[in-house]
Amino acid sequence: MAARLDRLKKRADFLRVAALRRKWAAPGLILQAAPASGTDLQADSLRVGFTVSKKVGNSVCRNRARRRLREAVAQVFPAHASAGLDYVVIGRKETLERPYSLLLQDLLAALKRVGALQKTHAAEAPDTASPQS
């Protein structure tokens, strides 16, 4: 069953996910995960927030990186990410130049490393990402 993607928008939600320190840095992105909080959440919803800092470049570069990450998440998360967690995807400089297929592999590997990969897909995910904290 495909989960529904919702967005994290409030700063407090981003800080809560970051405070848990459950993260994995892949060459193309950083993924953070935390148990979802809130009473209005549906059991099959995934909440995802995106952030790209000014280190990545000007606003054109940051928005391009954010668009690439949003599309990768839309492709990977409904089938592979565990529901009941909030996720924050952080863009890096490499997000812009990294081939899209490798960005998808980075996302799958990061899901596996933070323990958020659905059990049915755990055997399929590559473990190619190297830790960079």
Swiss-Prot record:
Name of this protein: Ribonuclease P protein component
Organism: Paramagnetospirillum magneticum (strain ATCC 700264 / AMB-1)
Record's catalysed reaction(s): Endonucleolytic cleavage of RNA, removing 5'-extranucleotides from tRNA precursor
Protein's UniProt keywords contain Nuclease: yes
Pfam families listed in its UniProt record: Ribonuclease_P (PF00825)
GO molecular function: 3'-tRNA processing endoribonuclease activity; ribonuclease P activity; tRNA binding
Keyword RNA-binding set for record: yes
Matches recorded under PANTHER family: RIBONUCLEASE P PROTEIN COMPONENT (PTHR33992:SF1)
Cited InterPro entries: Ribosomal_Su5_D2-typ_SF (IPR020568), Ribsml_uS5_D2-typ_fold_subgr (IPR014721), RNase_P (IPR000100)
Described purpose of this protein according to its UniProt entry: RNaseP catalyzes the removal of the 5'-leader sequence from pre-tRNA to produce the mature 5'-terminus. It can also cleave other RNA substrates such as 4.5S RNA. The protein component plays an auxiliary but essential role in vivo by binding to the 5'-leader sequence and broadening the substrate specificity of the ribozyme.
Family assignment from sequence similarity: Belongs to the RnpA family.
GO BP annotation list: tRNA 5'-leader removal
